[in-house]
A protein has these predicted regions:
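Long, compositionally biased intrinsically disordered regulatory segments in eukaryotic proteins
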Residues: 1-85
Length: 85
């Protein structure tokens, strides 16, 4: 029997963020979590997601002026609340 590793919510959020920011995605997300949630990234839970999504979307908007990309990024993060993407 092959053991499968269960992916954490933080790891799922990193995957989403890396789709938009490449390898810098994890560092970006870690900073958002540490700065705005005052928790370690590994402690991320669904109850923290709305605040994280809000701050991450604001910070992401400072990196691009493309509203469609900002909306897609935000919606992809929101999907973690509903289905864990």
């Amino acid at each position: 029997m092959i053991a499968t590793k269960r992916i954490t919510l933080y790891e799922k959020a990193v995957l989403v963020t890396e789709e938009y920011l490449g390898p810098a995605g994890e560092r970006f997300l870690r900073r958002q979590i540490n700065t705005h949630l005052n928790i370690e990234p590994e402690q991320l839970s669904k109850k923290n997601l709305p605040k994280l999504i809000n701050w991450s979307s604001i910070a992401f908007a400072l990196l691009t002026n493309n509203p469609k990309v900002i909306e897609a990024f935000t919606n992809d993060l929101r999907s973690l609340i509903l289905n864990g993407k």
